[in-house]
Amino acid sequence: MALAALAAQDCRPRAPLLPRAELAQNLAALPGWKHAGKALNKSFAFDDYYRTMAFVNAVAFVAHRQDHHPDLSVHYNRVDVVFSTHDAGGVTLNDCICAAKVESLAGSP
């Protein structure tokens, strides 16, 4: 599924774990995102703290609207974003949807 198609979706309650093939297909549409353990993660770099925090606030807005919240590690010029569906015990379509929405915030095509 393409990045724009993923980003256009909304999260669904009680999403099941993604099968490996579907996870691999979705990851192919998410530039720079990695599957590690039971999560998707990516680091985003910025020129300064102001831009870093603006991105964090934008991610918070998306997470609130989707009711799907990432773990964030905030640094001076970097944000590490980790999505996992804890209730499902790993990665679901909701994680891919939110990763695509976050990717769109960062300005990827």
Sequence positions of predicted segments:
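Charge-rich alpha-helical segments
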Residues: M1-P109
